A protein has these predicted regions:
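Mid-domain alpha/beta scaffold segments of enzyme catalytic cores
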Residues: 1-211
Length: 211
């Protein structure tokens, strides 16, 4: 079986894991990195890339992100929103999906989604919200990625074709999440792996899985 880890900060040691590693496979400006100067993460760590001039750099990656809005940490929401919208524009320009970090700013994120009308997929990573919040994201076309600490009701309500699984910053086998989610959803682990592989290719614009 092949496990997909849709968002992680650690390179896995397991041979049967395809991991989308933040800063290695994705390019973006996290809201926590906006003070004093925004610095997108790329291969080799943080790079002093000016905002809005990352087209050539970003086009080599699977996705833009993680980026987004955080009402509890980082600079003012005005600054966060301005930089986030630049990355939305970059996502559309280089035809890459968006990986989103959002804390206590869901209503504004949903409003921006409706206003921007993006053609590229957006993923809300590390979702722990309640079913009502899940529905609000699904209604405007989001993919939702679950990690440890998920809301069980939301996990069971999320359509399989819009779901992703991740370890985020936790050092733990992604297989542990798959096993737990399969039990909660009444699926075989193999079936869940197949569904996540399909979602990987859909979200990342038919990017072939590594062999």
């Amino acid at each position: 079986m092949l496990y997909i880890d849709f968002h992680t900060h650690h390179v896995p040691v397991e041979q049967n894991v395809v991991a989308v590693v933040d800063g290695r496979d994705t390019w973006g400006i996290h809201p926590w990195s906006l003070s004093p100067f925004p610095s997108p993460k790329g291969k080799g760590g943080l790079k002093p890339f000016p905002v809005g001039e990352g087209k050539g750099e970003a086009s080599r990656f699977l996705a833009i992100g993680e980026c987004g809005l955080d009402a509890l940490r980082g600079p003012s929401m005005d600054i966060q929103e301005r930089v986030f919208l630049q990355q939305v524009a970059l996502s559309e320009e280089v035809r890459k999906p968006l990986v989103i970090h959002c804390v206590k700013a869901l209503d504004r994120l949903l409003q921006l989604r409706r206003e921007q009308k993006p053609t590229m997929p957006w993923m809300f990573h590390g979702f722990r919200g309640k079913p009502q919040q899940l529905r609000s994201l699904l209604d405007v076309g989001f993919y939702v990625s679950f990690s440890f600490g998920y809301n069980e009701e939301s996990l069971c309500l999320c359509p399989l074709e819009r779901m992703m699984l991740e370890t985020d910053d936790r050092v733990a086998p992604i297989a542990e999440i798959y096993y737990n989610v399969a039990i909660k959803r009444g699926l075989e682990v193999e079936e869940l792996c197949r569904a996540m592989a399909e979602n990987y290719q859909t979200f990342f614009q038919k990017t072939p899985l590594p062999t």
